Amino acid sequence: MRTELDETKATVRRALEEVRRIARELRPEMLEQLGLVSALTALATKFADVSGIAVQRRFDDELPQLSDEAELAVYRVAQDGLTNIARHSGARNVELALERGPSSVTLRLVDDGRGLGGAQPADGGGMRGMRERALLVGGALAIKTGRRGGLEVRLEVPAEGAG
């Protein structure tokens, strides 16, 4: 019984290593070359140009160092969140923020669209993908109605070496 458990643990460990390897290979070139803040700036600029939705960027200075996997998760959640905003929200404005925590970084996307209307967010492919990315890096994802209506997507990921 113990041997089977050890073999199962080893299989899970190998699978996780493979997922991480694939994620690294899928890392956008901009993220690899310029870093997270520059990659998100470029993403926001392109999004605003294509969608016509104004993006206000707010990035804290001196963000804690993130692992490559956590940076990729933040970038992909921002990308998926912006895509959902363009498709579903009817928003005219969105705030894209990176906030420094003592041992984490938080991505916030807040729009002024129609929000959830009291409903729970649909768990479509985009939302499910965001949740899975958060879990893979030990992060936490919250999706809720924003303070002034609209929708807020919040992803907190641990800094490298934290936790």
Give the positions of each predicted feature.
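Coiled-coil dimerization/phosphotransfer module
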Residues: 1-163
